[in-house]
Curated annotation (Swiss-Prot):
It comes from Aliivibrio salmonicida (strain LFI1238). Keywords: Cell inner membrane, Cell membrane, Membrane. Its main location: membrane. Interacts with the SecY protein in vivo. May bind preferentially to an uncomplexed state of SecY, thus functioning either as a chelating agent for excess SecY in the cell or as a regulatory factor that negatively controls the translocase function. The gene is syd. It is found in: Cell inner membrane. This is Protein Syd.
Amino acid sequence: MPLSVEQALANFSQRYVEAWKEKHDSLPINEELVGLASPCIDETRNLEVLWQPVARDESIRLVNIENGIELDLHDDFHAFYGAQFSADMTAKFEGMNVELLQIWSDEDLENLQGNMLGHLVMQRRLKLVPTLFIAVTDDEMEVISICNQSGEVILDTVGTKKRKVLAESMAEFLEKLEPVVA
């Protein structure tokens, strides 16, 4: 039986934290998130926070986006962003550098919903098939997205029809990700 998106995300998150601990002998550290409240924070010291992913008590659906654009969003999208709190995590997918976007706090969730709504409105104006971003790449014009119609994970060139399928499903994509720790 294939893994659920939630389980695949939890597995990747665990691999990321273990890779960080192996390299730095601590939980992951982030300097940019100092002063921003989150259930992920284990410790704040000097100008950095030590953090770890925290599963939500109950998965959520991002219905504000659906209501705002009057579009049902793919279940994998809800599962990906609704399962846990975490800082963004760096990884490689088949040699490509990616930064997996995550929700740090409920306030961060509101920001994501606004950004996603803007992204979907732009796609609607350009008459593009809707995609839902989940990661960024080294190229600011390319993002990793879920195709809202098929559920495939794609390399999506922003504002164009140029798309390349990377994985048949979100769970498959997450299982193939390799954590990258600086």
